[in-house]
Each structure stands twice: as structure tokens, then as C-alpha cells.
């Protein structure tokens, strides 16, 4: 556990249409039922300021570096105003997306982008990384079918299968790079409840 906090920081990662937000909500409700102090938040967003930045990030076509800096600025506000205070009070913080999403969605568009994103994060908040990250592993073909069946509401939803594959393999690479922190939950053929039960086993 990181030394600046007393609580526990849990993040959910993966591409579009993989059930990540559903699992974040299910874990939040489970911990609430156990009378555990817990908050649920998301990125990009989580605070009034960061949510305004989110609107630009997910709807406007930005230059790659501008998009990365927008995401990092939103994260700094989110961490400073919400995540860190909650952790210091002993809460479990569940976050729907965090640093790995920035790596895969913004970092891949830049030269040496993976290292750049992690180094920027360390500069902004050197002691704050998740205690555990769940990568919800759903094959790109399955994920894009799910997205196509719902109302697509941002620029990432409407990108094609090549984009979905690129994002998917980025998350797989990161899960292999950080196996102690990032737990892969293979979810393509599982129900939401079955995925939830697998996640609970890691807590």
C-alpha cells in the first residue's frame, strides 16, 4: 500500500463495451452491503472541474499531446480533490479507469508514449498508484458488438475494430508488465455476476 494513504485504491481497466463500469458498480454495492467505507468515481472525471474536461476529451478531436495533457490535468484535480482525501480517511476508492487507460488511449498516439504517461503521473503524484487493478479482458470482436448495440455517445465508441484491437493489446501488455498489481479477469463468455465473483476472490 502506498505510504500517503490509509485506505485502498482499486481501479478497473479495459476498452469500450467490456462491462467495466458494471463491475465497478457491482463491487461498490457489495462493499456497501458489508458496511465498508467506500466511494465510487471515474476517469476522466470525478470532480466538477474534471467532468468539464471530460466533455472536451471525449467529444472533441484534439492533437495527441493536447489530449494527453487534458487527461492528466483532469486526473490531478481528481486525485487532489477526491481520491486522496477519501484514502486518507480510510475509505476504499473504486475508480472506473485510471492510469492504464491514459496509457492505452492517449499514450499510444505519442512516441515513447507509455513511458511518458507513467513518468508524467509520477511527477504529478509520485506516491499514488492503485493497490489493485482489474483488467476486464473481453475480446475486441465481442466488445465492438456490445458497443454497436447501445447508444454510442463519444468519439471512442465509434472507432473501428482496428482501434479496439490496439487498445485491447495495450491493456494485455500492461497486465503482463505489472502482474502483481493488474489482475486479468477473462470475461468474454461470463455473465456479469460470474465476473463479479471472480473479482471478489482477489480482495
UniProtKB/Swiss-Prot annotation:
Catalytic activity: dTMP + ATP = dTDP + ADP
Record-linked InterPro entries: P-loop_NTPase, Thymidylate_kin-like_dom, Thymidylate_kin_CS, Thymidylate_kinase
Binding site for ATP: 14-21
Pfam families recorded: Thymidylate_kin
Molecular function via GO: ATP binding; dTMP kinase activity
Disulfide-bonded cysteines: none
GO-annotated cellular components: cytosol
Name of this protein: Thymidylate kinase
Amino acid at each position: 500500500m502506498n505510504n500517503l494513504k490509509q485506505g485502498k485504491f482499486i481501479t478497473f481497466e479495459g476498452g469500450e463495451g467490456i462491462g467495466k463500469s458494471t463491475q465497478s458498480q457491482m463491487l461498490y454495492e457489495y462493499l456497501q452491503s458489508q458496511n465498508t467505507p467506500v466511494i465510487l468515481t471515474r476517469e476522466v472525471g470525478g470532480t466538477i472541474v474534471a467532468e468539464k474536461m471530460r466533455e472536451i476529451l471525449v467529444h472533441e478531436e484534439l492533437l495527441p499531446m493536447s489530449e494527453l495533457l487534458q487527461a492528466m490535468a483532469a486526473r490531478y484535480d481528481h486525485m487532489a480533490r477526491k481520491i486522496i482525501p477519501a484514502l486518507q480517511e480510510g475509505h476504499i476508492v473504486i475508480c472506473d479507469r485510471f492510469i492504464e487507460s491514459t496509457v492505452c488511449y492517449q499514450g499510444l498516439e505519442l512516441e515513447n508514449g507509455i513511458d511518458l504517461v507513467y513518468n508524467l503521473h509520477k511527477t504529478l503524484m509520485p506516491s499514488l498508484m492503485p493497490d489493485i487493478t482489474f483488467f476486464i479482458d473481453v475480446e475486441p470482436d465481442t466488445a465492438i458488438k456490445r458497443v454497436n448495440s447501445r447508444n454510442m455517445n463519444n468519439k471512442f465508441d465509434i472507432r473501428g475494430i482496428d482501434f479496439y484491437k490496439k487498445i485491447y493489446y495495450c491493456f494485455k501488455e500492461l497486465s503482463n508488465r505489472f502482474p502483481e498489481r493488474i489482475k486479468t479477469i477473462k470475461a468474454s463468455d461470463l455473465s456479469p455476476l460470474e465476473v463479479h465473483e471472480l473479482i471478489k476472490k482477489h480482495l
